[in-house]
Design a protein with these regions (language model features):
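Non-catalytic accessory regions flanking glycosidase/transglycosidase catalytic cores in CAZymes
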Residues: 50, 56, 62, 74, ...
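Solenoid-like repeat scaffolds
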Residues: 492-501
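Short glycine/serine- and small hydrophobic-enriched flexible loop segments
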Residues: 205-213, 264-275, 331-335, 412-419, ...
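Active-site-adjacent structural elements in enzyme catalytic domains
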Residues: 220-231, 253, 267-271, 283-296
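Sec-dependent bacterial lipoprotein signal peptides
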Residues: 1-20
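Ser/Thr-rich, Pro/Gly/Ala-heavy low-complexity intrinsically disordered linkers and tails
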Residues: 21-130
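Internal amphipathic alpha-helical repeat/solenoid segments
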Residues: 152-200, 208-222, 226-254
């Protein structure tokens, strides 16, 4: 079903709609997108290989919805007893589990104190939860990163506090209690509207895990978001989440899925298992296994081994070979392979990295022979040997084959994977993107706009300083030391951008990127 985007956007369908490019209500008949209204996130001032996949698990029963408003979400940061480790990277003798060599975060006497937000009777754990302290607390910098990667210039304390400060603002603006006590969701409309989508839910669950050690409510929030996910199953694949809910916590616009949301929810559950263990109120590992198996069964192309748009998108659907490039999540596919032992996830990983390279080398070449590294929002033919940019109007609108708010997330997804895995197949496309971005901007992030053709021509009317573009480029710039000045300029632009200047999507991608930029991420 095709999303009908809000008119309050620039030049075309969606870059500032603050929305997911993943509205996927269930198709009727031939399975293309149906007409429906997309959620407009609004500004913050809106007071508003073909192994047989595993059989899906039995879905949980929908929980009864009531009107409890849930707890307040305010957070105050206070010093933690245990100091964090400095973000300076030093080589570690042991390589990472998958590819490349990792670097230990090291130690520093002046690293300051980890932010352990506020006070809480249960120290941030849900009832019957496991250990009181997370394994990878915010500010602890315990993840080893690939040798040669960099961070913005500045003290660890300053980077941490910038990320922590924006987390507090983001939480106040977007985190909302669900209709049943103890449940939570991320509002896609800013301060007051209750509408949400599964993409936002996946982002929010990852954010909650990464905020452990900063926010004493992090685990309770995560478990509440997990409960909200369970209350909104897809009709076709009940272990997966229906893509769209309204303020009354009812699934709307077709109870089908959006693949990117499910991928992030599954990954968040693996992170939670690593962060807190699975012996508490929620068995995160078991929940992750169920959803990973369902994704492989319903949302990965059976022969093309690439993510489909949704659980309705399998062959013979006309969109079966359509790739939403923001679904390129190599760190997720890598983690799913390691966790399940399912070889097919290795094929999905290989296919994803191949598709990025094929789109860059085949379609981003300029007249002088150099590559911009830009990829389209949507590609067709992902179920065949070589994908190609979607034609205008193929799925969402006129810019389906251009680089806008969907493809803008690819540098972030590739970047976080390279930070932890060091896979050279991610580094090569990152180098292309970094070279192009430094050149087109002349080192000034304000010269980067929100949309381009694949050969680097700015789209008419595309605004500057968009966080959905700049924040992912900053994560990409972490890949190599020769990007340091460019990375520092991007970091300055990111920190300076007020939350009121962006909508849900830009602010949420900004926060997730700031966790990576301050080295407050980890791999499952």
């Amino acid at each position: 079903m095709r999303r009908a985007h809000s008119e309050r956007v620039w030049w075309a369908p969606a870059i500032l709609a603050g929305l997911v490019g993943c509205g996927n209500p269930s198709p009727s008949g031939d399975a293309g997108p149906d007409d429906h209204t997309a959620i407009d996130a609004g500004p913050s001032t809106d007071t508003g290989a073909d192994a047989r996949p595993s059989t899906d698990a039995t879905p949980e029963t929908d929980a009864t919805v009531n009107s409890d408003a849930g707890p307040s979400m305010d957070v105050t940061v206070s010093p933690d007893a245990s100091p964090p480790m400095d973000a300076t990277v030093t080589p570690d003798a042991s390589p990472s589990a998958d590819a490349g060599t990792s670097a230990d975060a090291g130690t520093s006497a002046d690293a300051g104190t980890s932010a352990d937000a506020g006070t809480s009777a249960d120290a941030g754990t849900s009832a019957d939860a496991g250990p009181l302290r997370p394994t990878f607390p915010f500010g602890g910098h315990r993840q080893r990163f690939t040798v040669g990667t960099i961070a913005p210039t500045g003290t660890t304390v300053a980077l941490d506090e910038a990320a922590a400060s924006f987390y507090r603002a983001w939480k106040t603006m977007y985190l909302r209690p669900g209709c049943e006590a103890g449940t939570f969701y991320v509002s896609t409309a800013g301060a007051t509207s209750g509408a949400t989508v599964s993409e936002a839910h996946g982002y929010g669950m990852i954010i909650a895990v990464l905020a452990a050690g900063l926010d004493p409510e992090a685990r309770a929030i995560f478990d509440g978001m997990h409960a909200f996910y369970l209350q909104h199953p897809s009709e076709r694949s009940p272990v997966l989440m229906a893509w769209n809910q309204n303020a009354a916590c009812m699934s709307i616009n077709g109870r089908t899925t959006a693949t990117d949301g499910d991928l992030d929810i599954a990954y968040a559950l693996l992170l939670a298992d690593r962060q807190w263990g699975s012996d508490g109120a929620v068995n995160y590992a078991a929940a992750a296994r169920r959803i990973i198996e369902a994704i492989l069964r319903f949302e990965i192309h059976p022969t093309g081994q690439s993510p489909m748009l949704a659980d309705w998108g399998a062959p013979p659907n006309r969109y079966a070979g359509t790739l939403r490039t923001s679904d390129t999540m190599p760190d997720h596919f890598r983690a799913f392979r390691a966790f399940t032992g399912e070889a097919r996830w290795g094929l999905v990983l290989d296919t994803a990295l191949f598709h990025v390279d094929a789109l860059q080398t085949g379609f981003s070449r300029r007249m002088d022979g150099t590559l911009t590294g830009l990829v389209p929002d949507f590609a067709t033919g992902a179920d065949t040997a070589i994908p190609r940019p979607a034609a205008a109007g193929w799925y969402e609108g006129a810019n389906d084959g251009n680089f806008t708010y969907i493809a803008a997330r690819v540098p972030w997804r590739l970047g976080v994977d390279y930070l932890s895995a060091g896979d050279p197949r991610a580094l090569t496309p990152l180098r292309r993107l970094n070279t192009w971005a430094r050149e087109v901007s002349a080192g000034d992030p304000a010269r980067i706009v929100g949309g381009y053709t694949l050969v680097g021509t700015a789209l008419t009317g595309a605004p500057a300083r968009e966080m959905v573009v700049l924040a992912p480029l900053a994560v990409a710039a972490m890949a190599e030391a020769d990007n340091q000045r460019w990375l520092d300029a991007l970091w300055g632009a990111i920190v300076a951008r007020p939350i009121t200047a962006e909508r849900y999507l830009g602010n949420t991608v900004k926060l997730l990127s700031m966790f990576a930029l301050s080295r407050n991420t980890f791999a499952p």
